[in-house]
């Protein structure tokens, strides 16, 4: 029987020593938003709860100011 070993998920923000997540840093925020525009959960990305809360708030702020779209482009 084959055993699959998953790579250990780690929090990128903890590793880089980030104090707070800025809503104007769009490159970082886009990495944590799915193709459909949903915020990717921490169980998939591996971010810690503290940073996941900051990330969600930053994404919501960026959406409100129209820096990020709420959904994907409908064609």
From Swiss-Prot:
Belongs to the bacterial ribosomal protein bS18 family. It comes from Saccharophagus degradans (strain 2-40 / ATCC 43961 / DSM 17024). Pfam families: Ribosomal_S18 (PF01084). The keyword DNA-binding does not apply. GO terms for biological process: translation. Binds as a heterodimer with protein bS6 to the central domain of the 16S rRNA, where it helps stabilize the platform of the 30S subunit. Keywords: Ribonucleoprotein, Ribosomal protein, RNA-binding, rRNA-binding. This is Small ribosomal subunit protein bS18. The gene is rpsR.
């Amino acid at each position: 029987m084959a055993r699959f070993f998953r790579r250990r998920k780690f929090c990128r923000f903890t590793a880089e020593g980030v104090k707070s997540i800025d809503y104007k840093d769009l490159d970082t925020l886009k990495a944590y938003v799915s193709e459909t525009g949903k915020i990717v959960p921490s169980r998939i990305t591996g971010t810690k709860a503290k940073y996941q809360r900051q990330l969600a708030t930053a994404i919501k702020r960026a959406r409100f100011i129209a820096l990020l779209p709420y959904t994907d482009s409908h064609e």
